[in-house]
Amino acid sequence: MTAASLEAAIEAAWEDRANVTPASDAVREVVEAALELLDSGKARVAEKIDGQWQVNQWLKKAVLLSFRLNDNAVIDHGAGGAPAFDKVPSKFSGWGENRFREAGFRVVPGAVARKGAHIGKGVVLMPSFVNIGAFVDEGTMVDTWATVGSCAQIGKNVHISGGAGIGGVLEPLQAGPVIIEDGAFIGARSEVAEGVIVGEGAVLSMGVYLGASTKIVDRQTGEVHIGRVPPYAVVVPGAMPGKPLPDGTPGPSLYCAVIVKTVDAQTRSKTGINELLRD
């Protein structure tokens, strides 16, 4: 089946999604084909074409349809060796040493990646969670307790620090996925959600929270960015002055993010990847 015919079949199933059940064998066939493309990295929910990110909505729809097709079942070999009860199997179900070596990435005990997520060569998954439809490109580190949400797009040589959250698209339903471009650094306990794009080489310090409406203020120029961090920007938490209250007293300040500088040699020395960890 060609990509065009697969897309058309998914779109048709989506229009009739209220009637999709575990007995919908024809729909299952095309949805599983789409999920295999996502799992292998041969297709992705968003891709950069001529410098612009384009979302393949039909692939996101395939992910959503899969939840109507599958019943919950016991999944062996869950986190910590405990069984789980879910609709999505582990990406690594049935894998042996040869399959892991062929894939070329590391999976530390406690890491969870669901079937339908793509993990590139040289990636390190510390005890973390990578959801269905996500794309994690080569050389990236997903550190301890970090989460890569459904359909999120993570570039090459990215560092997602401990406890950081990369939001998904499934609930609440989002039009586009979060995108972290090549070489970006996401600081510990930061959160990027609601389709925000973090540009190539950008650095978020610890505890930066970015959603679709978060103001990202350039301290030098006063320019305000919303929904996108410029490439190579260094971003820290900040606050905007609040509007006065009705009685004229100062109102509460509101959270924002602040671009304090552009990545320089000092920044790179603190946020660069360690090639020793990628072997």
Curated annotation (Swiss-Prot):
SUPFAM superfamilies: Trimeric LpxA-like enzymes. The keyword Cytoplasm applies. It is found in: Cytoplasm. GO terms for biological process: diaminopimelate biosynthetic process; lysine biosynthetic process via diaminopimelate. It comes from the Bacteria. Gene3D superfamilies: Hexapeptide repeat proteins (2.160.10.10), Tetrahydrodipicolinate-N-succinyltransferase, N-terminal domain (1.10.166.10). Signal peptide: none annotated. One of its GO terms (molecular function) is 2,3,4,5-tetrahydropyridine-2,6-dicarboxylate N-succinyltransferase activity. Its EC number is 2.3.1.117. Coiled coil: none annotated. Keywords: Acyltransferase, Amino-acid biosynthesis, Cytoplasm, Diaminopimelate biosynthesis, Lysine biosynthesis, Repeat, Transferase. Pathway: Amino-acid biosynthesis; L-lysine biosynthesis via DAP pathway; LL-2,6-diaminopimelate from (S)-tetrahydrodipicolinate (succinylase route): step 1/3. The keyword Transferase applies. Transmembrane segments: none annotated. Substrate binds at R106, D143. It is an enzyme of class 2 (transferase). GO terms for cellular component: cytoplasm. Homotrimer. Belongs to the transferase hexapeptide repeat family. This is 2,3,4,5-tetrahydropyridine-2,6-dicarboxylate N-succinyltransferase. It comes from Novosphingobium aromaticivorans (strain ATCC 700278 / DSM 12444 / CCUG 56034 / CIP 105152 / NBRC 16084 / F199).
